[in-house]
Amino acid sequence: MRNLMVLVIGLLGWTLTSAQTANTEKGKITGKLINTEGKAVVAATVTLQNATDSSLVKAVVSNKEGIYELENIAYGNYLLAVSSVGYEKTIKELSLHTGTAAMDFSIAPSSKTLSDVVIKTKKPLIEVKADKTVFNVEGSINAQGSNALELLSKSPGVLVDNNENITVKGKTGTKIYVDGKMMQLDNKDLAAYLKSINSNDIEAIEMISNPSAKYDASGNAGIINIRLKKNKKYGSNGSVNLGLVQGYTPKGNGSVNLNYRDKKINIFSNVGGNLGNYEEHLDLYRIQNDSIFDQKSRNVYKDKSINAKAGADLFLDSKNTIGVMATANFNDNTWGGNSATNIYYQPTGDYVKKLEAFNTIPGSRTNANLNLNYRYADTAGKTINVDADYGLFRGTGRSFQPNNYYAPNGDLLYQLTYRNYTPTDIDIYTIKADVEINKWKGKLGYGAKAAYVRTKNTFDFYNVENGTDVKQLSKSNSFDYKENVNAAYINYNRQLNAKWGLQLGVRAEQTNSEGVLTRADGIHQADDKVTRHYLDLFPSGALTWTVDKKNTLNLTYSRRIDRPTYQDLNPFENKLDELTYQKGNAFLKPQYTDNVELTHTFMGFINTSLSYSYVKDYSTMITDTANKNATFIQQRNLASQQIYGFSIGAPLPIAKWWNGYVNVWGNQQKFKGEFNGEKINRSYNLYGLYMQNTFNISKKKGVNAELSGWYNGKSVWGGTWVVKPMGGFDVGLQKSMFKGKGNLKASVTDVLFSQYWKSKTNFGGVYIDGEGKGESRTFRLNFTYRFGNNNVKAARERKTGLETEAGRIKG
């Protein structure tokens, strides 16, 4: 721990020292750019590089007179390069040893016409912007051959724990979007869906901490948007991708992308799949009442999944476009687990008995969405976007749970066997419209959305007696839930002057819901029907101050909401296994969060932020005693939460062949509340480190390498679980081939096999000490081949209307 803190402090010191060195006020370089006709060259890029290794020092753009200025440059020898579309790139040597050096350029027109030129740009792996951080997956070697869930764990500040809960910089409540559509799935179903998305089909992952009023208000820790690849070329083209993964067992994945585009229509399609087994080992040591349970488990997840997408855009004219898009995910998998639990009498430590339990959960999940879209855009800056969507989720949950109890001498005491049938049907209908116009010297946006959700859940519980399933009416039920959310927003954005920018917005959301529980035994309970109606306002705003050429400050605020998942509202008991029950909470309230963040951007690339969050009616999964020997789990509004945080991130252009990125974050979380008469007043200090390095080994041969790693200090989940520090690093190598059409990537993830979790909780009369390890260390081999027309033409980007309703489904 001490060594890690030294490393973190050293990295921060190095980053700040490097920034100060880059900013040493020594001298100035200025000049004028003209073409062969003597006219000024406007908006040309002027880059200053070290003469020794060609590493970037600074870059500016020429003004309308063709003048450029590079200020605060340390004395030394440099290369000065000028580039502009339609002109030849020009490079000159320059020595700065006095206060000001002048260097004018006369640049010649390019010998190639624009139609002859293929423009290629390479985005940095990590882009840090004032409002979001972008992980450009497409350019990462170590990201290939994995899936969307694994990629999230490799993103700056993101942690995916053993239960596949996603936290960002220690904060829970992040909402996951895919192509602008919120995934309305609970942890289990969301994880299964994300695992089915090949990393090779992902273009980028965007992390937005304080979304504007245009976005749905769900997500107290902001949103993560996974942008899938979309073909951007005229003509017929496509790509094929094949991947192999070797962990405990071999696995495979693949995808095919096809696209046709001309001036009138764009037709696109994609299909991909995953096949393989994933293994996890889990140990739990639990003390409850006067019993000790020492459990060791091995779980295997057998994954067979297919993702498909198809659609078309019809360009009616230069202003009007209509489109249709269908996406589907088919997941046919089996989760199987076996465990051995030694049970002791806690006061004396005497060995009482042993439980050998098995749990087999076969099932299929289907997630499909249909989107109809209309878009209008004119040259005056007016845009209109209308989306109509239908989404469905179908899950055929089943489980088979044999449990055998043995005496200390090994004799069989008794057997208990159960079978569950738990199908889930969810239908989602949404329609939304967004308008943006130039108004009051800025941009005015407004819109509305209506969403209707219907979910049906069945839980049938059976005792298996002499090979026959006997339905237990007192433990079986059905739960129907209906919800309607109507929303409207207005948002205004304006650059007030050269130094100040302003964004203000407010979103109103009206929620109507009804949950009805029907027990199979016909008994009514107090919470078998709960109806709610409430209206909320969610203001947001941002103020940007450009202090000078080197410093910019950005202050943002937003209010957010986290509604309960649909199944968390089902007030019936669900027997997960012999020792664990789960029950919903019909009276579970939404939690509300106020977020404030101040971001300082230095030299255009070093971002430092300070943040504060207050969460009202904080909800978490509580572990309690259902009876003497079983653990009882329920989602409850436990307490209030306060989070004080900081983060610093910067790209590091170390050398011409070596680029890096570092992000360090930390926060303090405070929880206050009461549970069963017990006062809660807890505080935790958390921190994390993320680093990414790319190496251009041979530009001529197209060989690149990547080294990335992360470390999270002690973290907290749900206010009651403390997770011990963990981390890991990956290495990868990439080779371009077949004249740039092919790409071969090889990588090793979690090289030191250090990504295992350990956590403890002592709450509600239950003490649990757990640890687990999955298949984090793997060897991955991935090959991609692109074919067809390679002329660059940007494709239309669009979000669907299912932005919120599709993350709250729980299977």
What annotation goes with each model-predicted range?
Residues 71, 181-209:
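Short acidic/polar hinge/loop motifs at secondary-structure boundaries
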Residues 307-331, 359-517, 546-551, 604-610, ...:
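Face-selective signature of the C-terminal outer-membrane beta-barrel domain
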Residues 217-224, 232-282, 303-306:
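Outer-membrane beta-barrel translocator/receptor signature
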Residues 424, 477-483, 532, 561-609, ...:
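Outer-membrane beta-barrel signature, preferentially recognizing the C-terminal barrel domain
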Residues 102-106, 148-151, 190-193, 207, ...:
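N-terminal periplasmic accessory domains that precede
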Residues 51-67:
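Short, acidic Ser/Thr/Gly-rich low-complexity loop/linker segments typical of extracellular
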Residues 34-39, 45-49, 83-87, 97-141, ...:
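Short, acidic, small-residue-rich periplasmic hinge/interaction motif at the N-terminus
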Residues 296, 428-432, 471-477, 589, ...:
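Outer membrane beta-barrel strand-and-loop segments of large Gram-negative receptors
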